[in-house]
């Protein structure tokens, strides 16, 4: 019950926001499965229209950002919440940001792709909210930084990636670029090329 009171109940516009059972169950199931299986395992939560998907995403993002393993180290370095539509991005940003008011915990990427690159490489933000369309530009920025010898990269970091509307956002060039950025494949490839040229 303390987890429910401390992690799920939220006051918004003078009213108390309380999870419905399916929302609470979804978040708890993802957290339990992550403890059991660790990072790197795909999970799927399905919601019908109007069932509070944005709140479930927000609660899940915050729960995963606070998750620590048996060694007390965070299981994920960052949680990246991705949507494929700008209109939904604004709504989702407001929902996720509304649950935690600790400065620097959440970064809303609503400007340039450089902002996303900085948030992924930096240490401040625990939850990053962005659109899928920004990742192809981040690959280019990372490659340019690596070529100039200024690459910080994300190699060795663990990301929890929450994709809104996964059925429409998990294929194509943008997703390939997302995987390159978050797995460090592109940075590693660029460094290999630079070493070969030296």
Mark where each language-model region is.
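Conserved catalytic network of the ASCE P-loop NTPase/AAA+ motor domain
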Residues: 72-74, 120-123, 151-155, 184
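Short, glycine-/Ser/Thr-/acidic-enriched flexible segments
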Residues: 50-51, 85-88, 127, 133-136, ...
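Conserved motor-coupling elements within RecA-like helicase/translocase cores
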Residues: 112-128
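Flexible phosphate/Mg2+-sensing switch loops adjacent to catalytic phosphate-binding sites
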Residues: 66-77, 104-109, 185-198
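Signature of the SF2 helicase/ATPase Hel1-core->accessory helical subdomain module
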Residues: 132-198
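ATP-dependent helicase/translocase motor core
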Residues: 1-79, 83, 87, 91-103, ...
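Short alpha-helical segments and helix-capping/turn motifs at coil-helix boundaries
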Residues: 64, 111-116, 145-148, 198
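Hydrophobic positions in the central parallel beta-sheet of the AAA+
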Residues: 81, 128-130, 161
């Amino acid at each position: 019950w303390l987890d429910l009171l401390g992690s799920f109940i939220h006051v918004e516009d003078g009213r108390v926001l309380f999870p419905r059972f399916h929302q609470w169950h979804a978040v708890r199931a993802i957290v339990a499965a992550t403890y059991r299986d660790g990072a790197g395992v795909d999970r799927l939560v399905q919601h019908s229209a109007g069932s509070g998907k944005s709140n479930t995403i927000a609660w899940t993002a915050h729960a995963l950002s606070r998750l620590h393993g048996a060694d007390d180290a965070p299981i994920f370095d960052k949680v990246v919440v991705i949507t494929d539509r700008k209109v939904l991005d604004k709504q989702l940003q407001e929902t996720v940001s509304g649950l935690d008011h600790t400065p620097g915990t959440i970064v809303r990427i609503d400007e340039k792709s450089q902002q996303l690159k900085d948030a992924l490489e930096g240490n401040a933000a625990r939850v990053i909210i962005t659109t899928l369309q920004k990742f192809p530009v981040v690959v280019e920025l990372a490659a340019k930084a690596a070529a100039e010898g200024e690459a910080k990269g994300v190699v060795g970091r663990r990301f929890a990636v929450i994709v809104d509307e996964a059925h429409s956002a998990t294929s194509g060039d943008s997703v390939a670029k997302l995987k390159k950025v978050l797995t460090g494949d592109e940075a590693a490839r660029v460094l290999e090329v630079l070493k070969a040229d030296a």
